[in-house]
């Protein structure tokens, strides 16, 4: 299997309305897909996509 076609763990860091830093974890092919998944599964991120301040690949 091609290594580029494997899912990798990503942590999406974001800040809520009180400026508290939170995180959500997803398996995705790249950071853009991790962002898309975060927006799909997290209502706050969906409504405030600019609250994301870091997307880190954990491998």
Describe every region a protein language model picked out.
Residues 2-22:
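Short aromatic-glycine-(Arg/Gly/Cys) micro-motifs in beta-strand/loop hairpins
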Residues 3, 18, 33-35, 50:
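Terminal low-complexity, poorly structured segments
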Residues 7, 33, 39-40:
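Basic/aromatic-rich interaction segments and small domains that mediate binding to polyanionic partners
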Residues 15, 29, 55-58:
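A structural detector for beta-sheet-dominated domains
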Residues 20-33:
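A short, exposed loop/beta-hairpin motif centered on an aromatic-Gly-Thr core
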Residues 39-59:
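Short, mixed-charge low-complexity intrinsically disordered segments
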């Amino acid at each position: 299997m091609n290594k580029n076609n494997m899912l990798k763990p990503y942590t999406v860091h974001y800040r809520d309305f009180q400026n508290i830093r939170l995180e959500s974890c997803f398996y995705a092919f790249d950071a853009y897909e991790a962002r898309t998944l975060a927006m799909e599964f997290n209502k706050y991120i969906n409504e405030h996509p600019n609250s994301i301040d870091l997307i880190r690949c954990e491998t």
